[in-house]
């Protein structure tokens, strides 16, 4: 089974537990912290895959390292360890945070532009496109693309809205030909 699909199942389960226990905010803080701690400490991951350590010893290491994390997060980490799926933590974190954003009516977008967009322009884009995709808020990351002549391309999920000058010229060209 695809690793992304498996991670999404764990993320969905953790999300449901967070909702049921009223700990969504706490777990939303814990998940990125765990992901970052693991990303910054490769030795810890190596230690967890060390064959001479027993499962109980590895569990003790996780409990100690993540003692400050909520119980559902600790239990998820322990379950991933037991099922030899600890490498899914980064993808699980991404999936979990996407579920939280979705529940809060937030979508992520990338705006490609020839120049840096002002805060006002980003707010205007957010307002227009949030409404288009049925979300309350659109968090936009602005990436400067020197290939663009002008205008903006906005990517939300797997959809691209082409508002670039070159895109407009291409549409005009097709209308004239066709």
From Swiss-Prot:
InterPro entries membership: ATP_synth_OSCP/delta_N_sf (IPR026015), ATPase_OSCP/d_CS (IPR020781), ATPase_OSCP/dsu (IPR000711)
Entry membrane topology: Peripheral membrane protein
Cellular localisation: Cell membrane
Alphabetized GO MF terms: proton-transporting ATP synthase activity, rotational mechanism
Keyword GTP-binding: no
Keyword Nucleotidyltransferase carried by entry: no
PROSITE patterns, per the entry: ATPASE_DELTA
Keywords: ATP synthesis, Cell membrane, CF(1), Hydrogen ion transport, Ion transport, Membrane, Transport
Family: Belongs to the ATPase delta chain family.
Function: F(1)F(0) ATP synthase produces ATP from ADP in the presence of a proton or sodium gradient. F-type ATPases consist of two structural domains, F(1) containing the extramembraneous catalytic core and F(0) containing the membrane proton channel, linked together by a central stalk and a peripheral stalk. During catalysis, ATP synthesis in the catalytic domain of F(1) is coupled via a rotary mechanism of the central stalk subunits to proton translocation.
Subunit structure as annotated in this protein's UniProt entry: F-type ATPases have 2 components, F(1) - the catalytic core - and F(0) - the membrane proton channel. F(1) has five subunits: alpha(3), beta(3), gamma(1), delta(1), epsilon(1). F(0) has three main subunits: a(1), b(2) and c(10-14). The alpha and beta chains form an alternating ring which encloses part of the gamma chain. F(1) is attached to F(0) by a central stalk formed by the gamma and epsilon chains, while a peripheral stalk is formed by the delta and b chains.
Name under which the protein is recorded: ATP synthase subunit delta
Native source species: Bacillus caldotenax
Gene name per UniProt: atpH
């Amino acid at each position: 089974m695809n690793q992304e699909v498996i991670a999404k199942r764990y993320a969905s389960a953790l999300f449901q537990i967070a909702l049921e226990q009223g700990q969504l905010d706490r777990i939303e803080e814990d998940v990125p912290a765990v992901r970052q701690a693991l990303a910054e400490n490769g030795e810890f991951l190596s230690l967890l895959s060390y064959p001479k350590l027993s499962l109980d010893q590895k569990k003790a290491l996780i409990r100690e390292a993540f003692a400050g994390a909520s119980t559902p997060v600790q239990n998820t980490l322990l379950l991933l360890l037991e099922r030899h799926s600890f490498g899914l933590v980064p993808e699980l974190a991404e999936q979990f945070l996407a579920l939280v954003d979705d529940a809060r009516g937030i979508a992520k977008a990338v705006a490609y532009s020839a120049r840096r967009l002002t805060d006002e322009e980003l707010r205007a884009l957010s307002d227009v496109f949030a409404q288009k995709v049925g979300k309350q808020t659109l968090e936009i990351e602005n990436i400067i693309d020197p290939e663009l002549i002008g205008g903006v391309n906005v990517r939300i999920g797997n959809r691209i809205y082409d508002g670039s000058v070159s895109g407009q010229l291409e549409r005009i060209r097709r209308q004239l030909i066709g």
